[in-house]
């Protein structure tokens, strides 16, 4: 069931989440989505999954902007070690997430609704629901079982649709230009103090 109140709350929260959080990543993500000719709405999936928090970590051990689980990360060759978690790297995680979305899109016969549902609920769960419907089982069973856990996701997704259709009413403007670059390093570097390493002159993008 669509919850208009939740939609309004999330639309307000999305504005509050501000461009400041999305700005370091959004240009890169949009560019990668466009390169693959995927729906531009997918660029806002990190808003739904993690509120554009690259360090987000869930109780199910999903992490990063796209909330990739260890199993999905491993399958799509994202490195996870005590020193480095590629799920928290916008480049590695975006590559894996878009590969995963393309796989799900193909797996569900080109149905983006099912593909995105599988991203949130799990591939097997959505496949079982589709099978139940095809076998004339009660399709409401799936809806009832997932309504509570998926309600907030649907509300956020609807709010994202509003943002795309009426951008002037939502996000403040973000510069349409690159904000990140790949930097060469010769050894392991601890980057916990972002203000400190951003000021280091030796960290300059490769031209």
Swiss-Prot record:
Protein name as catalogued: Putative tributyltin chloride resistance protein
A GO MF label: peptidoglycan lytic transglycosylase activity
Top-level taxon: Bacteria
PANTHER family linked: MEMBRANE-BOUND LYTIC MUREIN TRANSGLYCOSYLASE C (PTHR37423:SF2), SOLUBLE LYTIC MUREIN TRANSGLYCOSYLASE-RELATED (PTHR37423)
Positions of the catalytic residues: 49
Slt-type domain as annotated region, ranges: 37-122
Family: Belongs to the transglycosylase Slt family.
This protein's GO CC annotations: membrane
InterPro entries per record: Lysozyme-like_dom_sf (IPR023346), Transglyc_AS (IPR000189), Transglycosylase_SLT_dom_1 (IPR008258)
Entry's Gene Ontology BP terms: peptidoglycan metabolic process
Record Pfam families: SLT
């Amino acid at each position: 069931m669509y919850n208009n109140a939740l939609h309004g709350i999330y639309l307000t929260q999305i504005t509050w989440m501000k461009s400041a959080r999305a700005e370091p990543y959004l240009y890169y993500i949009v560019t990668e989505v466009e390169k693959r000719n995927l729906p531009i709405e997918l660029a806002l999936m990190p808003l739904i999954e993690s509120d554009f928090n690259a360090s987000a970590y869930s109780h199910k051990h999903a992490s990063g902007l796209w909330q990739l689980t260890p199993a999905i990360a491993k399958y799509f060759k994202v490195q996870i070690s005590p020193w480095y978690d590629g799920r928290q790297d916008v480049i590695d995680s975006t590559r894996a997430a878009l590969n995963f979305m393309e796989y799900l899109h193909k797996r569900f016969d080109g149905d983006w609704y099912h593909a995105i549902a599988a991203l949130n609920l799990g591939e097997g769960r959505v496949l079982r629901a589709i099978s139940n419907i095809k076998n004339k089982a009660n399709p409401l069973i799936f809806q009832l079982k997932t309504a509570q856990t998926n309600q907030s996701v649907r509300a956020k997704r609807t709010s994202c649709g509003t943002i795309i259709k009426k951008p002037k009413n939502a996000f403040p403007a973000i510069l349409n230009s690159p904000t990140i670059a790949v930097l060469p390093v010769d050894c392991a570097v601890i980057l916990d103090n972002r203000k400190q390493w951003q000021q280091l002159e030796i960290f300059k993008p490769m031209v």
